[in-house]
Amino acid sequence: MNQKKICYLTYQSFPAETANSQQTISNIIHLTRNNKDVKLIFPLREKNSSDSIEKIKKVYNFNENFSIQGISHNYPFGKFNIFSKSSFHISHYLWAKKTTKKILSSEEHFDYFITRSDWVFYFLSKNKRSVAFEVHQISKIRKLILFVRRNAPNSKLIFLNELLQKQLHSFTSLQNSTVLHNGVDVSNFANLPKKQKEVVFVGSLKRFNKDRDLRFLIEAFNISELASTHRLKIIGGPQESVEELRDYIQKKYSDLNIEIKGRLSRFDAVENIKSAEIGVLLNEGSNDHSKYYTSPLKYFEYLAGNLKIIASDFPAHKSLPYSKNILFYKDGQTDKLKDALNKSISVKPAEFNKNNISLDTRAKKIITFLET
């Protein structure tokens, strides 16, 4: 019997320092570990885009082999700084239409497709291909496409959390959808070192082109009991934000035990999580995606690393697996974050079933969803 082939066809760019690119690569790695023949196809739309498997392996720190094909991208998005939103939608539509037509008319056969891209989903669904669309947020175009293709029998939807599925239920057919939170490669957390007295934030210092409010975290840490016993460690980029934070700390909190490490490799970031005692999730409260629809990769890494976890009391965070163990604080209220930091001294990390947060389990569920 021939092995079923899966094509992960997406408008994302690789390699990239983004959580969404990490999530896609992680999915593919674990589908591959489950003996699936997977091919990643994406546009070469950024200056640093590359379909070299060795470059991809180095950035995302893995050893598995799978097929990668970068497709040329002769469209405006990424080439100009003006009208970026409009150029994204136009370029996305044109690239998806041309690329899906090319793939479907080629001699290479795929049994299933997975995508995170609206127009890729639309054209594959329209051509009656078996496709699973990973839905991570809401947009007007997405609602329209989901509504138009809601009764397509081979078109399936994977929602990142229950709130997202509920919000889009009137645009979809629920029998063709499922909810799968993000997960973690638990093998990376098999051997945990002795915990250091560290509070850690790991992630991009910007989200949706806005600064994550790291100053808010620093101010709360400064007035907490942990300021005299723990180190606050902030890991992430871009470098411009790193330098701004370092200047801010030098001017206002030079006596505090704070380390701004900037971006680290995947391996080094995981090692820092494993040795920390407390992990903090910060999100932008004015953004609906952050507030309602996210399932942060870092949450699952903190959980697997046996960290005590502090997070803003957003509905998305409250819908996470094992959320009853999270120390919640009111977004934007320094005193409440200080209280959560103080409380973390006396609580224990969450008890959890590794299989429930494993990317391997998630991959198995995706395979079952595709094949039924």
Segments from the language model and where they lie:
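N-terminal strand-loop element at the rim of the active site
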Residues: 10-18, 30, 36-91, 121, ...
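Nucleotide-sugar-dependent
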Residues: 19, 208-212, 267-272, 279-301, ...
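A charged, aromatic-enriched C-terminal amphipathic alpha-helix characteristic of glycosyltransferases
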Residues: 187-188, 332, 339-372
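Conserved donor-binding/catalytic core segment of Leloir-type glycosyltransferases
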Residues: 7-9, 158, 184, 192-222, ...
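Short amphipathic alpha-helix
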Residues: 20-32, 217, 298, 366
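Carbohydrate-associated surface elements
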Residues: 163, 183
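Nucleotide-activated donor-binding/catalytic signature segment of Leloir-type glycosyltransferases, i.e.
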Residues: 236, 244-273
